[in-house]
Structures are given as C-alpha cells and as structure tokens.
C-alpha cells in the first residue's frame, strides 16, 4: 500500500478538491475550531479594515488537511478583496512571481501554498515586495541588463506550509502574523461532519457524526473523506441515514479502526511489539521488517502515532508505548 492509496492520508487527493470547495466555510463565524487563531484573526482583520489598510503578511503552518487554504480564502472574504492562489513549486522563475504581483489590486491576497519550496531566486524577488511593495526586476541580458523598480499596490501575502522550520530566516521574519493550526478535537470535528452532511443533504445523527469524527485523526479533510464513504455505505446497505451503527460498520469495512488507524499503522505497531519485543528498534530494521521505505515510516506513518502517544522515539530506536499494547488488548512486558 502506498500513501496515495490510503483513505486516511491527510494530503489532498484528486477527488477531494471540488467536493471540499463546496464544504468550505466562507467567513470566520462559519469556521469551526482553532479558537485562538480565529480570535486573533478577528482582531487583526477588524483593525486593518478600520485603518483602511491591507492586512499584514500572514504565515499559516501546521499538519496537512487542517484548513490552511480555507483560512486564506476566509481572510480575503472578510477583507472584501480578491485572492490569487499559487504554490511554491509552480513559481520556478522570477517572472512567474512578477506576473502575479503586477496583477494584484490594492488590498488583494496572494496565497502561496507550500511556501517553503520557493526557489531562492523567487524568494529574493519577494523580499522587497513584502517589505516595501516594490518589485525589482532585470530588463535585458548581459552587459545591457539593467534593474528597474516597479511600485506595487499594498497587498497581503498569505503563505502556507507544513514545514515552518524549512523556511529561511529572512522570509519567516517578514511575516507579521504567524498562525499555527493544531489537530482538531473530536467535538469540533463532529460539528464539521454535521455541517458537511447538511451541505450534502445527508441525514446524520449526533452519534453517527461523533463516530466519524473520532476516527478522523484530528483532521477535517479526513473527516469529510470518511463521511463521503459512509454515505455510500448508508445509501446502499441501509436507508441512507447515518447513525452510529451505520458509521461503525462502514468504517470497519473500510479498515479504519477506532483510533483512525489503517492496515499500515497497525502493521508498524505490531512489528515493534511482536518482532522486536516492544523495542527499541532502529529505523532501518523496522523498515526491512514491514517492507516499507524508511522515509515512508519517518514522514508518513510515524508522526500521527507519535503525536497520539503510541510510539516513542529514543536515541536507541522506536519503542511501542503502553497505549500501543492496550490498543491490541495486550499487556506490555515489564
């Protein structure tokens, strides 16, 4: 199984985009969860509107699937301006960024996803644009080349990244508003599932929404994806309504257990428990034992398991925690 095949992967899949767009909240009052972030944004947005200024540049960071793109769109809606969206890997040349910047109107939002992947040459162009609303570009080539400055309208750059530490210090320092998104609690995810079901005109009760939410790994994108699959099951196997019974059976059929684990998660945990007596075990040995690349374990499988307290990283290797043993109804040896 590869990451792109996993139902519970947080990265966006092709089928998510159009459906997620319909489910996205448009304004801050419709946005569920991230209470501290919402409270801060309300103040910053109102202050900028009162002064009739562009909002400060904003960096939104955190794990994938938590709503960074949605939040950028909400900022534009709240400010009553347009938003232009792109991503770091797409901006290969300075001219690519210059074309976007020169088409912005006063107050507009420029959203750059995966901003940590900007090339150095593009990043250099961004510095004066962010600080002074100026664009330094080279005209011509060789000895005849000359630099000209173009004035830009005040704008707001919203950068999104899953790896804030990968940003260069000069770029990170130019964001006046850093916002970290955290994994969602089950209550907030239940609210999101219920709202999405309403958009889909799907009958769901509170227990059904809760069951989907608690298996969604704290991630709205996964919750919405699971909801769509549970809807299929409810319409084919039952009367179309989603109850706790229907959600449990649908998600069990999809091999997503009570903790939101799939086959790959359980395979990793059981390898540590059964093959290495609970650990510690080195990454290379673990990769060989389950037939996966070490990068897949480190970047895809481990983060959620560590965050939830099922695995510990130690200097000697990976260790399965008491909670991991309890999940499989096993007793951890002393």
Curated annotation (Swiss-Prot):
It is found in: Cytoplasm. It holds the Pfam family RuvB_C. InterPro entries: AAA+_ATPase, AAA_lid_4, DNA_helicase_Holl-junc_RuvB, P-loop_NTPase, RuvB-like_N, RuvB_C, WH-like_DNA-bd_sf, WH_DNA-bd_sf. Residues 185-255 are annotated as: Small ATPAse domain (RuvB-S). It catalyses: ATP + H2O = ADP + phosphate + H(+). Mg(2+) binds at residue 69. GO terms for biological process: DNA recombination; DNA repair. ATP binds at residues 24, 65, 68-70, 131-133, 174, 184, 221. DNA binds at residues 294, 313, 318. SUPFAM superfamilies: P-loop containing nucleoside triphosphate hydrolases, Winged helix' DNA-binding domain. Residues 258-334 are annotated as: Head domain (RuvB-H). The keyword Chaperone does not apply. It comes from the Bacteria. Its EC number is 3.6.4.-. Belongs to the RuvB family. Homohexamer. Forms an RuvA(8)-RuvB(12)-Holliday junction (HJ) complex. HJ DNA is sandwiched between 2 RuvA tetramers; dsDNA enters through RuvA and exits via RuvB. An RuvB hexamer assembles on each DNA strand where it exits the tetramer. Each RuvB hexamer is contacted by two RuvA subunits (via domain III) on 2 adjacent RuvB subunits; this complex drives branch migration. In the full resolvosome a probable DNA-RuvA(4)-RuvB(12)-RuvC(2) complex forms which resolves the HJ. Has 3 domains, the large (RuvB-L) and small ATPase (RuvB-S) domains and the C-terminal head (RuvB-H) domain. The head domain binds DNA, while the ATPase domains jointly bind ATP, ADP or are empty depending on the state of the subunit in the translocation cycle. During a single DNA translocation step the structure of each domain remains the same, but their relative positions change. The RuvA-RuvB-RuvC complex processes Holliday junction (HJ) DNA during genetic recombination and DNA repair, while the RuvA-RuvB complex plays an important role in the rescue of blocked DNA replication forks via replication fork reversal (RFR). RuvA specifically binds to HJ cruciform DNA, conferring on it an open structure. The RuvB hexamer acts as an ATP-dependent pump, pulling dsDNA into and through the RuvAB complex. RuvB forms 2 homohexamers on either side of HJ DNA bound by 1 or 2 RuvA tetramers; 4 subunits per hexamer contact DNA at a time. This is Holliday junction branch migration complex subunit RuvB. It comes from Shewanella baltica (strain OS185).
């Amino acid at each position: 199984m590869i990451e792109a095949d996993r139902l519970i992967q947080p990265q966006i899949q092709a089928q998510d985009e159009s459906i997620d767009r319909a489910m996205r909240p448009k304004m801050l009052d419709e946005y569920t969860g991230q209470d501290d972030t919402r409270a801060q944004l309300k103040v910053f947005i109102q202050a900028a509107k009162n002064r009739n200024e562009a909002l400060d540049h904003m960096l939104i960071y955190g794990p994938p699937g938590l709503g960074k793109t949605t939040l950028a769109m909400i900022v534009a809606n709240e400010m009553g301006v347009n938003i232009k969206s792109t991503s770091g890997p797409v901006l290969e040349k300075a001219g690519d960024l210059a074309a976007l910047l020169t088409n912005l109107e006063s107050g507009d939002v420029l959203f750059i996803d995966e901003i940590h992947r900007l090339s150095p040459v593009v990043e250099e162009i961004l510095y004066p644009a962010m600080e002074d609303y100026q664009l330094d570009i080279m005209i011509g080539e060789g000895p005849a080349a000359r630099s000209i400055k173009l004035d830009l309208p005040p704008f707001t750059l919203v950068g999104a990244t899953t790896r804030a530490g990968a940003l260069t210090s000069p770029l990170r320092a130019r964001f006046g508003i850093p916002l970290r998104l955290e994994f969602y609690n089950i209550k907030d995810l239940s609210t999101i599932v219920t709202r999405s079901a309403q958009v889909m005109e799907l009958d769901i009760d509170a227990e059904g929404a809760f069951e989907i939410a608690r298996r969604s790994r704290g991630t709205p994108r996964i919750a919405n994806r699971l909801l769509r699959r549970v809807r299929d099951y409810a319409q084919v196997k039952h009367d179309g309504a989603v109850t706790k019974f229907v959600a449990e059976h649908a998600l069990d059929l999809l091999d997503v257990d009570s903790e939101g684990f799939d086959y790959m998660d359980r395979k990793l945990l059981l390898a540590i428990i059964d093959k290495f007596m609970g650990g510690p075990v080195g990454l290379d040995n673990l990769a060989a034992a389950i037939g996966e690349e070490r990068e897949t374990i480190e970047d895809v499988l481990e983060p959620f398991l560590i965050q939830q307290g099922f695995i510990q990283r130690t200097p000697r290797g990976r260790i399965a925690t008491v909670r991991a043993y309890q999940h499989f109804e096993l007793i951890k040896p002393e």
